[in-house]
Amino acid sequence: MDIRPSEISKILKEQIKNFDQKAEVSEIGWVLSVGDGIARVYGLDNVQAGEMVAFPNGVRGMALNLEVDNVGVVIFGSDRDIREGDCVKRLGAIVDVPVGPALLGRVVDALGNPIDGKGPLKETERRRVDVKAPGIIPRQSVHEPMSTGLKAIDALIPIGRGQRELVIGDRQTGKTAILLDTFLNQKPFHEKGAGREQDKVYCIYVAIGQKRSTVAQFVKVLEERGALEYSIIVAATASDPAPLQFIAPLAGCAMGEYFRDNGQHALIGYDDLSKQAVAYRQMSLLLRRPPGREAYPGDVFYLHSRLLERAAKLNAENGSGSLTALPVIETQANDVSAYIPTNVISITDGQIFLETNLFYQGIRPAVNVGLSVSRVGSAAQIKAMKQVAGSIKGELAQYREMAAFAQFGSDLDASTQRLLNRGARLTELLKQPQFSPLKTEEQVVVIFAGVNGYLDSLAVSDVARFEQGLLVLLRSDYQDLLQAIAEQKQITDELKDKLITVLNTYAKNFS
């Protein structure tokens, strides 16, 4: 066999020329100890706070405590397969989630992975979950109504686009039902050819620490009523680890910010933030952070304020988009003065206070009109609603005051008796069954009838029947009247005369 040295050197030179060295450099550390969803890791010297790390079994974690000799990592998953001495790799990215229209109609976990069995998500972009809220300059004051379809709220405690309105009450008082009805009320604007893009509101529901059956029921109702197509469900259920329950609201908020920053409107319900605070407390105590009041860490206020400040109404230069937040807080025995409730009340622009007593008396939604408030007020109402709802607040306040005194004496003068009668009927008028939100113009006509004395001669038990009959009549014969109120957004003298004529005829024939 003849080997030519010149050929060998030529081949070697070619191979050296084509040699491509690929070196993948990644910083790694080792698990010192693991337990209760927390891993102590040695060796990740350059890791950032909030950075994702990967464990050998594919489970992700987030670096939270950066200490001198180790890093405290919270684990987004089960810690059963993680052992002491396991290798942990930095991923170089802060926690992010998929966002965009591809998520509409889907149920995802706290990290944005689909859990509804409908296959992978289509094209999406990714956003960090924990970003800074918009500053003062890009914002605009809240001035557009966010209609919930509930008379008691739209008339007395109006919510505007970009507002943060707290829904607070004991367990089983209908907090989630208010969120659900508000979602369902956005449906008419999403029907084909119905609304303009600026009328559409995309809905995000974040379930934190709830039973899976409850979340499944919520999704089922949305699906049956055609509201899932414009909604995103983010679920971190009771069986999920605390870090996922902690991050779920931040992930849902990032998904809502996509719509806000693209000039669209989104509504997000956090159900509920008490459980997020509990999850955060658990993580903080296990990370050995010093406890404060009720054993919550010192920055639990900051946790909620930085989340809720991300809800905003942006000005025209920034696209005029909005993100409205409806955080839910569960109280214990109506104690609104506990730590977390007072924190969230001070952060939000008002609260809807639901009471067990009212709920069991059959007043549903069980809104305590005296304690509930919207700090945006009538700026978030159309003029027509202001015209009719202005007097109902005063009348109900007087009614509550008088009702307390009326228990002690029976000999009441005629004006007091009239006030009590009117108040009882207005309270009855504000009741509303679940899953039956009303359009704003329908609410205006119904409340107009209430404040102008059309209910005064009826028995309290007939008020609901009177209202139903009136709505049927308006929808069938007076669609033009409703249309005129919706378009003009105010009750002109001409419309008022028409309304009075319709109501006089209806009241005369009602029996």
Curated annotation (Swiss-Prot):
Family matches, as Gene3D superfamilies: 2.40.30.20, ATP synthase alpha/beta chain, C-terminal domain (1.20.150.20), P-loop containing nucleotide triphosphate hydrolases (3.40.50.300)
Binding site for ATP: G169, D170, R171, Q172, T173, G174, K175, T176
GO CC terms, sorted: plasma membrane; proton-transporting ATP synthase complex
Lineage: superkingdom: Bacteria
InterPro entries hit by this protein: ATP_synth_asu-like_sf, ATP_synth_asu_C, ATP_synth_asu_C_sf, ATP_synth_F1_a_nt-bd_dom, ATP_synth_F1_asu, ATPase_a/bsu_AS, ATPase_F1/V1/A1_a/bsu_N, ATPase_F1/V1/A1_a/bsu_N_sf
CDD domains: ATP-synt_F1_alpha_C, ATP-synt_F1_alpha_N, F1-ATPase_alpha_CD
GO molecular function, one term: proton-transporting ATP synthase activity, rotational mechanism
Family designation: Belongs to the ATPase alpha/beta chains family.
NCBIfam families cross-referenced by the UniProt entry: atpA, PRK13343.1
Membrane topology: Peripheral membrane protein
PROSITE patterns (alphabetical): ATPASE_ALPHA_BETA
Chain positions of site Required for activity: S372
Native organism: Bartonella tribocorum (strain CIP 105476 / IBS 506)
Record carries keyword Membrane: yes
Reaction(s) catalysed by this chain's protein: ATP + H2O + 4 H(+)(in) = ADP + phosphate + 5 H(+)(out)
Name of the protein this chain belongs to: ATP synthase subunit alpha
Entries under Pfam families matching the protein: ATP-synt_ab (PF00006), ATP-synt_ab_C (PF00306), ATP-synt_ab_N (PF02874)
Function of the molecule: Produces ATP from ADP in the presence of a proton gradient across the membrane. The alpha chain is a regulatory subunit.
EC number annotated for this UniProt entry: 7.1.2.2
Subunit field text: F-type ATPases have 2 components, CF(1) - the catalytic core - and CF(0) - the membrane proton channel. CF(1) has five subunits: alpha(3), beta(3), gamma(1), delta(1), epsilon(1). CF(0) has three main subunits: a(1), b(2) and c(9-12). The alpha and beta chains form an alternating ring which encloses part of the gamma chain. CF(1) is attached to CF(0) by a central stalk formed by the gamma and epsilon chains, while a peripheral stalk is formed by the delta and b chains.
Gene: atpA
Lineage, highest ranks first: Bacteria, Pseudomonadati, Pseudomonadota, Alphaproteobacteria, Hyphomicrobiales
Compartments reported by the entry: Cell inner membrane
